[in-house]
A protein has these predicted regions:
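Feature for exported/extracytoplasmic and membrane-associated proteins, marking the mature portion
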Residues: 1-302, 306-312
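Acidic/histidine-rich, metal-coordinating catalytic segments
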Residues: 316-319
Length: 319
C-alpha cells in the first residue's frame, strides 16, 4: 500500500493549484486574521456591500412592473399584473405584490430601483447570461469574476469578501485568489479531518512554490473558520426537508433568510469583511409563473427588508 504523505498530497494537489487556492483564498495565517477580527474590527459605519444573486433567470417585468404600459399587458395577457395588484412606486411602475417589505423601504427612502441594466446583444442562454453578469465580460468568456478581480487588485486578505455557502460562485474568483467560502453554522469538520487540514497548511521550508500555494489554501480554510467561529455561536440548523422556504443555489441547502441573518451577525460583530455574497435559486419559472415567482420574491423580500439588518449596508439583487 502506498503511504500518502503531506508532500505527496501537495504535489498531487498542485495539478489543481488554482482551484485549491481559489477554494481557500488568501495568503495570510489564521493567527493574523483572528487578531484583526478582535483587535482591529471593521470601524462602525463602514460601507458594506451584500450581493444577492438570483439564479434561474428572474422575470424582471413582473418584478418591477410597468403596470400602465399597454404593451406590457398585450404581450402577457395571462400573467400581467394590474394597477390594483402591485405596490405602486409612481404613476407608471410598481413592485410585485409579494414585495411588501421592499415597498415599505421605498416609502422610507431606503430602496432604489435601477432599470434597464444590461449589455449589447443579450445572450438568451441562462448559463451564458449568468456567466456574463458574474464576470462582466460580455464579449468573451473569462475565468475571473468581478469581485475576484477587485480582490486581486486590492490585497490578499481572505475575509475581505465572503460567500455564504460552500460553493464559491464565479463572481468571487480572481486570478490570484478568491473570496472565502463560509458555510452556515460553526466549523463542522470532524476533529480528525480538521487536524489533518491544519497539518497540511503548516509551513515547511522544503516546499516548492506550487506546494506553498496549495498548503496556503488549506491554512486559509482554517483561517476563515477560526475568524468567524466566535461570531457564529451555535450552529444554524438547516431547514427541514418539508420547509417551503426556497433554497439558495450557491448557498447550499440554506434558505436566504438564514444567509442574511448570518451576514447581519457578522456585520454587527465587526468582522473585517466589506463584501458578502448570498444567493437564491429557483427563478427558472415556466409553469405557474406568477405563483412560483411570488414565492421566490417573497423569500427575497423577507430577508432583504428584515428589521434585524444593521443600519449600514447595501444589498444588491441581480434580477
Amino acid at each position: 500500500m502506498n503511504t500518502l504523505t503531506r508532500r505527496r498530497f501537495l504535489i498531487a494537489s498542485g495539478t489543481a493549484g488554482v482551484a485549491a487556492a481559489a477554494a481557500g483564498a488568501g495568503l495570510v495565517g489564521w493567527h493574523t486574521l483572528a487578531q484583526r477580527a478582535t483587535a482591529d474590527p471593521l470601524p462602525p459605519g463602514s460601507r458594506i456591500l451584500v450581493i444577492v444573486t438570483l439564479y434561474g433567470g428572474n422575470d424582471g417585468l413582473n418584478t418591477v412592473i410597468p403596470y400602465t404600459d399597454p404593451a406590457y399587458h398585450s404581450a402577457r395577457p395571462d400573467f400581467a399584473y394590474t394597477a390594483d395588484q402591485v405596490h405602486q412606486l409612481d404613476g407608471q411602475l410598481g413592485l410585485n405584490p409579494a414585495m411588501t417589505g421592499m415597498a415599505g423601504l421605498w416609502t422610507a427612502g431606503r430602496l432604489a430601483v435601477v432599470r434597464g441594466v444590461g449589455y449589447p446583444h443579450p445572450d438568451h442562454s441562462h448559463f451564458r447570461s449568468m456567466d456574463i453578469w458574474q464576470t462582466a465580460s460580455p464579449d468573451s468568456p473569462i475565468t475571473t469574476g468581478r469581485i475576484g478581480r477587485w480582490l486581486d487588485a486590492t490585497g490578499d486578505d481572505p475575509v475581505r469578501a465572503v460567500n455564504i455557502g460552500s460553493v464559491l460562485p464565479p463572481l468571487a474568483v480572481g486570478a490570484k485568489g478568491a473570496a472565502a467560502a463560509l458555510t452556515l453554522g460553526r466549523d463542522t469538520l470532524p476533529a480528525d479531518l480538521a487536524a489533518a487540514i491544519t497539518g497540511l497548511g503548516a509551513a515547511d521550508p522544503s516546499d516548492t512554490a506550487a506546494q506553498v500555494s496549495v498548503a496556503t489554501s488549506y491554512c486559509s480554510e482554517r483561517t476563515v473558520a477560526s475568524t468567524f467561529s466566535p461570531v457564529l455561536g451555535a450552529p444554524v440548523t438547516p431547514p427541514a426537508a418539508d420547509d417551503p422556504s426556497p433554497a439558495g443555489s450557491a448557498g447550499g441547502h440554506s434558505n436566504l433568510q438564514q444567509q442574511f441573518d448570518l451576514v447581519a451577525r457578522c456585520v454587527k460583530a465587526g468582522v473585517p469583511t466589506t463584501v458578502y455574497t448570498v444567493s437564491l435559486g429557483g427563478f427558472d419559472t415556466h409553469a405557474d409563473e406568477k405563483g412560483t415567482q411570488e414565492t421566490q420574491l417573497a423569500a427575497l423580500d423577507t430577508a432583504a427588508s428584515s428589521p434585524t439588518w444593521p443600519a449600514t449596508r447595501t444589498a444588491v439583487a441581480w434580477w
